[in-house]
């Protein structure tokens, strides 16, 4: 599902059962695995040199691992990885990788706690 006014870069890769809410920018070279939720107004970036990388410089979008959840208004820096079943709270700015099954929040995003077992997505059979 892709929400209204959202844009997906031509080189982005999306898995199955991905939900992209309204007004999301999913940049090229982003990788989104199965069962991911992306809240409204999320912005991803893929260029940490702001077009001044020089010869051989490559763009790198974020990677969102299986069943992670990204809250509204989150900003994901180039190349960050959001771990499997991780939760990024609304308004966070993620500049470093987020470990699997953790909750992060803040600017910059910091680990607050682990995601409780009862909040994990059960694998589909």
Regions from the PLM with identified roles:
Residues 115-124:
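A glycine/serine/threonine-rich, flexible loop-to-helix segment
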Residues 1-105, 110-111:
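Structural signal for interior beta-strand "rungs" in well-ordered beta-sheet cores
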């Amino acid at each position: 599902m892709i929400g209204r006014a959202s844009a997906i870069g031509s080189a982005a890769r999306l898995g199955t059962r991905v939900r992209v809410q309204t007004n999301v920018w999913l940049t090229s070279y982003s990788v989104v695995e199965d069962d991911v939720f992306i809240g409204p107004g999320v912005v991803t970036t893929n260029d940490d040199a702001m077009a001044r990388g020089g010869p051989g410089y490559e763009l790198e979008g974020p990677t969102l691992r299986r069943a992670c959840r990204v809250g509204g208004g989150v900003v994901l820096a180039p190349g960050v990885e959001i771990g499997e079943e991780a939760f990024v709270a609304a308004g966070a700015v993620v500049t470093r990788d987020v470990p699997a099954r953790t909750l992060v929040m803040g600017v910059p995003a910091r680990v607050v706690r682990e995601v409780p077992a009862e909040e994990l997505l059960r694998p589909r059979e």
